[in-house]
Regions:
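Short, aromatic-enriched amphipathic alpha-helices that serve as compact interaction elements
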Residues: 1-19
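A short hydrophobic beta-strand element
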Residues: 77-94
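Short, cysteine-centered beta-strand-loop-beta hairpins and adjacent loop/turn segments enriched
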Residues: 60, 89-102
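A solvent-exposed, acidic/Ser-Thr-rich amphipathic alpha-helical stretch
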Residues: 2, 20-75
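A short, structured loop/turn motif at beta-sheet edges
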Residues: 73-82, 113-120
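Short beta-strand segments enriched in hydrophobic/aromatic residues
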Residues: 27, 86-88, 125-128
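Short, surface-exposed coil-to-beta transition loops
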Residues: 66-68, 83, 104-109
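Short beta-strand edge/turn micro-motifs at domain boundaries
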Residues: 103-132
Length: 132
């Protein structure tokens, strides 16, 4: 279970480290990959679109921090479902206008992972409960 939660932590740590390359390493580059989010566009996204939007999101937030709260990990053979509450904080930066806005978001997430040689994310669903 520890290696599963580590994959989720690597995903969100990208917001702190800005090491965007790991996003492609921990997610399954396959037509089977999908993601949903509460950030437009709201449609079901494929691997390439998800990576591009994640990179844009993580580089647009400075002083990023997060907390995964009450994770529930269910393992089924070579797949796992991780459901959790999520607190994200940081400064949303507009580099063109040289402005920033503090953000604090309480949300929830569900990640589905599969294991071949290593655990990889095959589906992400993130949603806001409220902005603080």
């Amino acid at each position: 279970m520890e290696e599963i939660i580590k994959v989720i932590e690597i995903f969100f740590d990208t917001g702190k480290t800005k090491n965007l390359g790991v996003l492609k390493d921990i997610q399954l580059n396959s037509p089977d990959f999908s993601s949903f989010s509460d950030v437009p566009p709201f449609d079901l996204k494929d691997f390439a679109t998800s990576i591009a939007l994640e990179e844009l999101r993580f580089v647009s937030i400075s002083d990023y921090d997060y907390e995964i709260i009450k994770p529930k990990i269910s393992i089924f053979d070579n797949s796992a479902v991780v459901a959790f509450e999520l607190l994200q904080k940081g400064m949303l930066v507009d580099n063109k206008a040289f402005t920033g806005e503090h953000m604090s978001i309480t949300g929830r997430g569900t990640f589905v992972l599969i294991k071949n040689e290593a655990w990889k994310i095959v589906h992400i669903h993130l949603s806001k409960i409220k902005d603080s």
